[in-house]
UniProtKB/Swiss-Prot annotation:
This is Transcription factor zip-3. It comes from Caenorhabditis elegans. Pfam families: bZIP_2. Residues 243-304 form the bZIP domain. GO terms for molecular function: DNA-binding transcription activator activity, RNA polymerase II-specific; RNA polymerase II transcription regulatory region sequence-specific DNA binding. Residues 266-286 have a biased composition (Basic and acidic residues). InterPro entries: bZIP (IPR004827), bZIP_sf (IPR046347). It is found in: Nucleus. Coiled coil: none annotated.
Amino acid sequence: MQPSYDADDFMRRGFFGSFIGFRKRSSSKPEPPVPPKFAPPAAPSVAPNFRASDSAAPHLLSVPSNRTEYDIYREIVSEAEYIERSSPASPDFSCPTTPQPSNYYTPLPLPQQPPTFDPSTLMPQQQMMFHPGQYHMVMSPIAPHPIPVDTNGVPLGTQCPMAPPPYSSFAPQSSSSGMLQQQPQDLVIPQDIPFDVKREIQEHLVLQNGKKQMSIEEIVKLVVVALKDSQIEEGREEEESPEEILRRKRIQNNLAAARYRKRQREARESAESELGDLTRRNDELRDQVSRMEREIDRLKQAVLGRQ
C-alpha cells in the first residue's frame, strides 16, 4: 500500500531536491529503526526523485502514522516562521562575524503539542555531504527538509560572507583625535600687524606644523605675546626725546583735527543735499496742488454753464 503524501514527501519531491542531487554520507553506520511500541511499523518509502551515489548507503525514510491535518499545519507554520526569521529583511535577522564552534544547526523550538505518535519511530539524525570542502546538509526530525550549513555549522541563509570584523577590533577614536587628523588650513594673518611679528608667527607655525595642529586660542596667545615683545623691544631700542614726543603729539592732533573737519564737511554736505531735495519736493507738490485747483475751477464752470 502506498504511504500517505505528507510534508516530508512534499519537501523531498520539490524542485530543490530534484534539481540538486544530494549525496548522503553518514559518519557512523546507520542504526536500524526501533519498532514502535503501540503502532505497527510503516513500510519504508524512498523518494523517487532523490538520487544517491552507488557508494552511499541507502537512506530509508520512516513515515509516521496517525498524523492529523493539524500536525501538518503546525509543521508548515513553524517552517514558514523559520524561513521568515532567516530572511535578511526581517528584524530578527542576525549576521555573525565570528565562526560558531558548533558543528550542527540547532533549530528553533516548536510549540508544545500533545504527541500523536511514538517518537521512537523516528530515524537518528543523519548528515548528508554534498562535497567535503563546501557544505553539508543536516537532517533534523523537527526540520524535515535538509538545511544547508557551512563547515562551521552556520546556516548559509543567515551568514554574511562580506561582513566587517567585530567592533571591538577597531580602536576607539575620540573627537580630539579626529580633529587632529584633519588637514591644517592656511591661517589668515591681519595686515596691520608689524612685519617682525608676522615673521615670528610664521616661523613658529612652520616649526609647530610638523608636531601638532595649533588651536585658535594658542594662535591668539602667540599674537599677543609677539606684539608685547615687539613693543618692549621698540621702547628699549629708541628712547624718544621731549621734542620728538611734542612733534608726535602735534601730528596726532593735526590728524585728528583733519578727520573732524572732514566729518563735519561731509555732514554739512549731506544736510544741504537733503534740504535741497526737500525744497524741490515741496515746490513740486505746490505746483501739483495749483494744477488741481485750476482743474477744479474749470470743472465748476463747465457744470454751471450747462445748467
